[in-house]
A protein has these predicted regions:
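Glycine-rich phosphate-binding loop and adjacent beta-alpha segment
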Residues: 262-335, 369-370
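C-terminal capping/lid region of NAD(P)-dependent oxidoreductase domains
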Residues: 6, 328, 334-342, 350-370
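Mid-domain Rossmann-like dinucleotide-binding core that forms the NAD(H)/NADP(H) cofactor-binding site
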Residues: 168-239
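A structural motif shared across PLP-dependent enzymes of the aminotransferase-like
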Residues: 139-152
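A short acidic, Gly/Pro-enriched loop at the edge of an enzyme's catalytic core
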Residues: 246-254
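Glycine-rich beta-strand-centered segment in the early N-terminal region that forms part
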Residues: 65-80, 94-141
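N-terminal Sec-pathway targeting helices
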Residues: 1-18
Length: 370
């Protein structure tokens, strides 16, 4: 069986490499607009990059966007950073560069996704928002003073009880946790759920959401984060510096893995016979190699066809409904936003990303936009 699995994985990898070579030829001439645009007539500050790598981030004046007929113009008040941002900035794993259309240089120079702010203007077809409304959500190019977002896209009204920093923390981490627990993990009352990386951005949301679904939750974190994870409602906490959860006797119905630091076979050992293993967002930013965590995701997909256990990777899908649900849960006190650090300027985006990259953030890392 193992030999068959290995050959299947090899064939899949070969096909992926061939696909990549095709994309490589198509995108070899990929470039961007750095140095080619005229000086902005209506400038705003934004974090941009002309090449891959954290060292290439710059805070520059670019043209302030104007909303089209179906968009809202948002004055950004706060943004948050995610592992996704690190992958996007670094173009890592290398396979990702083909997916975003920039093998040599990034095609898109704008950065950031999670935001919260105030509507400054709306397009002629927009009726659900008006100038002055406070909103939050996700949009490419969020690391800026202004952004335009389709009014029916991933944007929702910000509840009055939330700060801009809290609201900016919700989008990717909150939706990933909600969809991981509800949709991919299919958590049911009474099930035993283990969350690896319980003190991070997604993990802090996932612990609380899994508890709201009636699960018996075990969180895995470091010694310094035990009290935090307990305060979020975890029934049990495993200190990974002292204990390896894959070597314990406990079996879990669902494992939500935000870290990806154990092999699939190790995780399968502590899954129930019909258990569900969910690799969240590709694992940590430390995954290296051409495919990064995608290799593990492919292995998981293959495993699932030969065993009763379900194994796979999930990426959050933008959802206005889920944004609204999460905001209501936070506003009502049913869900707590954990913020580790708040930086005070867009110029500190590189520092925020470096801190997140270390892998020890407690909850979310936020930046206030001046």
């Amino acid at each position: 069986m193992k030999r068959i699995l290995k050959w299947i994985v090899r064939i899949v990898l070969i096909l992926l490499v061939l696909a990549f070579l095709f994309v490589f030829v198509a995108y070899w001439r990929s470039t961007n607009d750095c140095g080619k645009t005229a000086a902005p007539t209506n400038p705003m500050k934004a974090v941009v990059r002309c090449d891959y790598g954290l060292a290439n981030l710059k805070l520059e004046d670019i043209e302030k966007p104007a909303p089209d007929a179906d968009q809202v113009l948002v004055k950004v008040r706060a943004v948050s950073v995610n592992p996704y941002d690190w992958h996007f900035i670094e173009g890592s794993p290398k396979f990702m560069r083909a997916m975003i259309g920039g093998l040599r240089k990034p095609k898109d120079i704008r950065l950031g996704v999670d935001f919260a702010g105030t509507v400054e203007g709306v397009g002629k077809n927009v009726t659900q928002y008006k100038a002055g409304d406070e909103v939050f959500g996700g949009s490419t190019g969020a690391f800026a003073q202004y952004l335009c977002r389709r009014a029916t896209g991933a944007v929702a009204p910000k509840p009055a009880g939330l700060t801009f920093e809290q609201a900016a923390s919700i989008n990717i981490a909150g939706i990933t946790a909600l969809q991981g627990v509800r949709d991919k993990g299919k958590v049911q009352p009474g099930q035993k759920v283990l969350i690896n990386g319980a003190s991070g951005g997604v993990g802090t949301f996932a612990v609380q959401i899994a508890k709201s679904y009636g699960a018996d939750v075990t969180g895995v974190c470091s010694t310094r984060n035990i009290e935090l994870v307990q305060s979020l409602g975890a029934d049990h906490v495993i200190d990974y510096t002292k204990e390896d959860f894959t070597k314990g006797d406990e079996k879990y119905d669902v494992i939500l893995d935000n870290v990806g630091n154990h092999s699939l076979s190790e995780c399968r050992r502590v899954l129930t016979p019909n258990g569900n293993y969910v690799l969240i967002g590709g694992g940590s930013a430390n995954e290296q190699g051409f495919l990064g965590a995608l290799g593990k995701a492919l292995n998981a997909a293959v495993y699932s066809h030969f065993v009763k256990q379900k194994m796979g990777m999930m990426m959050a899908q933008p959802s206005t409904q889920d944004l609204t649900l999460l905001a209501e849960m936070v506003a009502s006190g049913k869900l707590k936003v954990v913020i580790d650090r708040t930086y005070k300027s867009l110029s500190e985006v590189p520092d925020a990303i470096r801190y997140l990259e270390q892998g020890h953030a407690r909850g979310k890392v936020v930046i206030t936009v001046e």
